[in-house]
Structure formats: C-alpha cells, structure tokens
A protein has these predicted regions:
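A short SAM/SAH-binding and catalytic strip from SAM-dependent methyltransferases
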Residues: 136-155
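N-terminal auxiliary segments of SAM/dcSAM-dependent transferases
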Residues: 1-40
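Conserved SAM-binding strand-loop segment of SAM-dependent methyltransferases
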Residues: 116-128
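Conserved SAM/SAH-binding beta-strand->alpha-helix loop
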Residues: 105-107
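SAM-dependent methyltransferase
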Residues: 172-226
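A short glycine-rich, Lys/Arg-flanked "PGG" loop and its adjoining helix->strand segment in the class I
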Residues: 153-167
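Conserved class I S-adenosyl-L-methionine
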Residues: 75-84
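A short acidic, Gly/Pro-enriched loop at the edge of an enzyme's catalytic core
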Residues: 126-138
Length: 273
C-alpha cells in the first residue's frame, strides 16, 4: 500500500516538506534493516547507492577526497556541513582532529551518533546553528553548495560560512563542472557558459511491521552546477577566494579550496549592524 498516494494533495505537500527519505535510508542501512532508496526525475529512476555514497571505507576514497580532508585538518575545529552518516567526521576523529557535523536530516544525524560520533547537530546550512567565528574550516562536500540554486544563492551561503569561521579560515566545497558534463541524472541545460542544473527528488521504500509497503517521498531538489570559473564569480563579493581546484584527471566533479580574507568578513558584519 502506497501511503503517500492515498493522502489529499495538501497533505502530501506537507509530508514532502517534512520527509527525510535519505536520512531514513542511512539509518536503515546502519541498522541492517531492509529498504530501497531511489532518485526520481519524472519516470526516470536511479539507485541511491547508500552504502557506496555514505558508508564506504576510506581505503576506497580517491586522492582528491583524502587531500581535502588532510588540508583542513590543520585548521581545526572543522565544521562538516551536510555531514550525512558521518564518514568524514569519523576519519578526522581517527586522526585526532576536532570536528562538528551539521545536517538538515534528523535521521542522518542520528545515524552519525549511533556510529559513535556525538558532536552532530540538526540544522539548516543557510542559518547554521553554531556561534560566529567558531571554526577554522568548513567542509561542504556532497554538492550541497548547488542548493543555493543560483550564483547569488551560492554567494549568500558563502557569507554564512564566513560568519561561522575565524579569520584566515579555509573551506572546501564541491560541484560538477558543466563544461565537462553533457548529461547526468536530473540534468537541465542552461544557455550560459559554465552553468547547468540538476532536479530530482528522493524516495525511500520499506516494508512495515504490518506487512504493508511504505514509501517516503522527499521534496524536489534543485542544484546549480557551476564551473570553477563561475564559482570564482560567486565568491567575488564575499571574503572567500578560490585557491586550488582538486579533481581526478578528466573528472567532471571537482573540489575547490577557498581561502578567507578577514577584512571582507568584517565589512559585511558592520553593514548588518
């Protein structure tokens, strides 16, 4: 029985706003409970790959992933934005590095805690539930940056990262480079050079204790994809500057290392007073 379909449209919209299919999939995987996570874009679907995306061993990570984690280790404490099930947090903990995780998903945070990492918070990355100037680094890897939806939205998110970090902080963010990407799941083209979009939603299905099939449907997610050149444009009016760009040869996915100029952060703070 599909519980999501049997409710009135208004109720379904409210349920989707509150739904947490990705977090539930993480928690179910951690507890070795059955369930299936899929990405959906209209009739097209793609497997959610919960184990490989959120529970993979560090031995399987590529060099750019490890390099980004190592570079931030010297800037502790680190704020891991969109920490998910806590894989990167656990890596830092194993290396004696202080970090705190934040995720919008209550079930993802619960999963990270049950895996042994207690310093995790439920919160919105656009209004982070942490004090000003509290961290030496921000790690936001999982293409969350694209949820800004536009270059202006990314710029506002970077200002929030600036608020919670100390002078001369470092941030690592990631995205897919549209100049090297013709198609991916949920892909939407854009006439502007170095800009594209992804749109899809997540669904988690499981069998209930009553033997019925339950499906949790999340809201539609819109990601802005931008090239490193476009990311530099987004940082132009923020304290951040793009330093190194890390990626495997020919890969569309990249990580950008951002360095913070303290004077610009103070200028924004004074404007808001």
């Amino acid at each position: 029985m599909d519980r999501e379909r049997t409710r009135p449209a208004g109720d379904r919209d409210e349920m989707r706003a509150m739904a947490d299919p990705l977090g539930r999939a993480m928690l179910a995987h951690h507890r070795d409970e059955p369930g299936e996570l899929v990405y959906r874009d209209g009739p097209a679907t793609q497997d959610g790959n919960v184990e490989s995306f959120y529970f993979s061993s560090s031995e399987s990570w590529d060099r750019p992933t490890i390099e980004a984690l190592e570079r931030l280790a010297d800037r502790e404490p680190i704020l891991d934005v969109g920490c998910g099930a806590g894989n990167h947090l656990l890596w830092w903990a194993d290396h004696g590095v202080r970090a705190v995780g934040v995720d919008a998903s209550p079930n993802a945070v619960l999963t990270a805690r049950q895996r042994g990492f207690e310093a995790t918070l439920v919160g919105d990355m656009f209004a982070l539930p942490v004090p000003t100037d509290a961290f030496g680094a921000v790690h936001a890897v999982g293409t969350q940056l694209g949820l800004g939806g536009s270059l202006a939205g990314i710029r506002e998110l970077l200002w929030e990262f600036a608020r919670v970090t100390a002078d001369e902080a470092t941030a690592v963010v990631d995205n897919h480079d549209p100049t090297r990407l013709d198609e991916c799941f949920g892909y939407r083209s854009d006439p502007r050079e170095g800009i594209a979009h992804r749109c899809f939603h997540l669904e988690f299905e499981r069998d209930g204790a009553d033997g019925e099939r339950y499906r949790e449907v999340g809201r539609t997610l819109h990601f802005l994809l931008c090239s490193p050149v476009r990311l530099r444009e987004a940082t132009a009016e923020t304290p951040w500057r793009v330093g190194d760009v890390l990626r495997a040869n020919g890969d569309t996915h990249y990580r950008a290392v951002l360095e913070k100029a303290p004077s610009r952060a103070r200028d924004r703070s004074l404007e808001s007073e």
